[in-house]
Amino acid sequence: MVSELELKEIIGKVLKEMAVEGKTEGQAVTETKKTSESHIEDGIIDDITKEDLREIVELKNATNKEEFLKYKRKTPARLGISRAGSRYTTHTMLRLRADHAAAQDAVLSSVNEDFLKANNLFIVKSRCEDKDQYITRPDLGRRLDEESVKTLKEKCVQNPTVQVFVADGLSSTAIEANIEDCLPALLNGLKSYGISVGTPFFAKLARVGLADDVSEVLGAEVTCVLIGERPGLATAESMSAYITYKGYVGIPEAKRTVVSNIHVKGTPAAEAGAHIAHIIKKVLDAKASGQDLKL
């Protein structure tokens, strides 16, 4: 049986050995820290949203990568993404979150007023007071407020053959990305057809149906609104043109002709402008739009 004195001696030896080992390990760690140097580079982190998903296959063991890419190039859908266990890989998750954030920004942000001035567009607005009301009350987004009605009557040509205007809709980003190329191409195209055009302007917090109110206020034969579309994970920059012949408040949606997917990976803005002008010419010739127009 170990006596109390022997037990104290054993414990003392163990503590001394632990102290020596701890000191040695601490020195080793310290030496390691001294020899390792952190390397920090100045610069800008690459924007992950600039990668073209149609050119990326994340599957590590793809049997025929080139053949799979042929399918991917035909769609913006997220095909061929990889997983870590049951979860997305870090790259895939970051891209999803980045695209979702871009979509949120497109809806909740506003078009820069300096941008509108640079494109000679004065501002009117719907009856919505803010973005929250715009999202929850679509009916108010379809009507002009009283001040805007007065502004249009003062600044715009009355009874134009075609009234073209721009609206933020659900994507302010789409307007800033496409209008500089699309609007001039559209106006020049109409001019080349000898069609008179009213005074372009910008409508804030507007829905597609606001074009009907504009048509009644200005007496336009054809109304065309270039509006930002609801963004998604594929793109936050998609714009559409809604064309209506002799629109009025309450007109059925089926009476509108639509040119959609106007963005850099869809129909290019300048090309879309020329195409819209051609469609408007057909609308005027047929005196009809929407399902009544045979293209």
From Swiss-Prot:
GO cellular component: a single term: ethanolamine ammonia-lyase complex
Transmembrane segments: none
EC number assigned by the record: 4.3.1.7
Keyword Oxidoreductase: no
One protein family per Pfam: EutC
Cofactor annotation: adenosylcob(III)alamin
Pathway the protein acts in: Amine and polyamine degradation; ethanolamine degradation
Residue sites binding adenosylcob(III)alamin per the record: V208, E229
Record keywords: Bacterial microcompartment, Cobalamin, Cobalt, Lyase
GO biological process, one term: ethanolamine catabolic process
Compartments in which it is found: Bacterial microcompartment
Main location: other
Record note on quaternary structure: The basic unit is a heterodimer which dimerizes to form tetramers. The heterotetramers trimerize; 6 large subunits form a core ring with 6 small subunits projecting outwards.
Listed PANTHER family: ETHANOLAMINE AMMONIA-LYASE LIGHT CHAIN, ETHANOLAMINE AMMONIA-LYASE SMALL SUBUNIT
Name of this protein: Ethanolamine ammonia-lyase small subunit
Organism: Fusobacterium nucleatum subsp. nucleatum (strain ATCC 25586 / DSM 15643 / BCRC 10681 / CIP 101130 / JCM 8532 / KCTC 2640 / LMG 13131 / VPI 4355)
Gene that encodes the chain: eutC
